[in-house]
């Protein structure tokens, strides 16, 4: 493993370019010592494990990342560099200023080179004190830089000058072989310095299917570390770690997501280490209650089992095999995170006059600073939870008591039944499949035995098959058979509130008459209800 890194052609070109820039820096006279360059952290780890990685951190010995990035831009404009390398080899250079607020202490430059996403950063030493929550940061040695990293397997360097892998912690190779996540220094102090390292350890343990060292787990359970994780770290940083655990930003390219192993392991570790109420919570509310997570494992275990079963039943094919593809599974794991909040009462945001929010929505907004798309996904799921369960149970109850399948309903009863279900799904919106998955996982979490859980699964399977038989799976996308401007011409009147009411009337007619495609029939229905719809003369 120590000699296991073989560069690809593009990686070798990148290495040579960086070395050329390092040599070029000496010719300018501003730097007396040629910078030593190292690939650091995750890229080295992944290369040793035989994994592909396009993200490369470049650690620089004697100048900041932004300084080295500027030199790169100067160098590639030189005639000899243009002859040696492709035109436009560098992408846009972005400088990230040093920011010591809330445990984020990096000054880097980011750019894209040869298809790689490059972060340029100086080797550094961080010194923490009890007086300040933020460390003093200064240039450091490779050893000091390695020791301040979150884990030994992420503290390995690939020296560009010697083409050798360096293990300054003395344990990186060993822990990589033993499949152990371990902090380079004492875990309690390491996590106290930057509590986000707790979540990073969980993320790498779940992604690589490694074990967390027992002494590290013990430190993660420490009350001071849990309090620091809740209050010291910006929730945006928490969000990034949680979403990465679940397959973000490219769920379609995440094998651990598709296999269910990674996300399941991450949630089970958060659960076992008793960190749920430090992560999925509103840290701005000092009086925020601790939500009960004793049944949460049933939800994330059930989702794992559904993904790994290989069975293409209606739950998997309809809810996880939706047009969203892998993103549907990513959303399912996200929603699973908030199952413990499902039955909690509405809550009022702190320092806000806004309407009350579902507890899960508030935990998502404040706990992981969920972006609007994710916030709406969670809010929809919780808001429609009871309605979904009632609609599903109504059909299951009728099947059991009458011994008749709904499909055999006749006449007006069948027509109204399809309309009722279709309107319900349209009310649940474009995320209705995810909302149904949330309801399913919530009900499974509330069961006491495997037999009870199977009854829940059978009920959802039958209901989803029924929706499919009624051709309602895409009803949320159903458009009125007649457009609004056509309606106004038909009634020779101006638009107004009546138009939207009339279009809804048409949707209802279409749900009752799925085999009819003639606009005349739909318009006739609007004419019949003209007075009810307040259509002006």
Question: Regions from the language model: what does each represent?
Answer:
Residues 1-537:
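Catalytic cores of the polymerase beta-like nucleotidyltransferase superfamily
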